Amino acid sequence: MIEESKENSLKYFLIQSVASVIFLASILNQSFSFLIPFALLIKIGAAPFHMWLVSISKSMSWKVLSLLMTFQKIGPLLGLAMLSSVSHLSWLMVNMSSFLLMLVYYVTYLAILYFAVILLQQTPMYSLAQMNSNAS
């Protein structure tokens, strides 16, 4: 268990470091500025760059995972909000009209995620197949 925790910590560190290097390199070199959103999406763990989050979250406790899924996303989400355009997620465009609306959205996201984590922590399910068998 400790070895797996060390491995996941190293994976997280390396992926976040690579994303930070891509982000900084794309800021310094204007010809690669199109890579800024990609670096931020890697840091958030958004699709199609989400596979690192899935592999790391397998062995995490729910408390640590909830921190990873909430507070670690604040910086990159704000960075994406500053780059927002019609092609980005629609809720990011809300930030252009009202910071309060974005704050309400994020607090709602935190509350939903918190209750989902609490529910999943108290239920001994480890796959979607178990969820389906418990429903019948």
UniProtKB/Swiss-Prot annotation:
GO terms for cellular component: mitochondrial inner membrane. Its main location: mitochondrion. The keyword S-adenosyl-L-methionine does not apply. GO terms for biological process: mitochondrial electron transport, NADH to ubiquinone. It is a multi-pass membrane protein. It is an enzyme of class 7 (translocase). The keyword Transit peptide does not apply. The chain crosses the membrane at residues 12-32, 34-54, 74-94, 99-119. Core subunit of the mitochondrial membrane respiratory chain NADH dehydrogenase (Complex I) that is believed to belong to the minimal assembly required for catalysis. Complex I functions in the transfer of electrons from NADH to the respiratory chain. The immediate electron acceptor for the enzyme is believed to be ubiquinone. Belongs to the complex I subunit 2 family. This is NADH-ubiquinone oxidoreductase chain 2. It comes from Artemia salina (Brine shrimp).
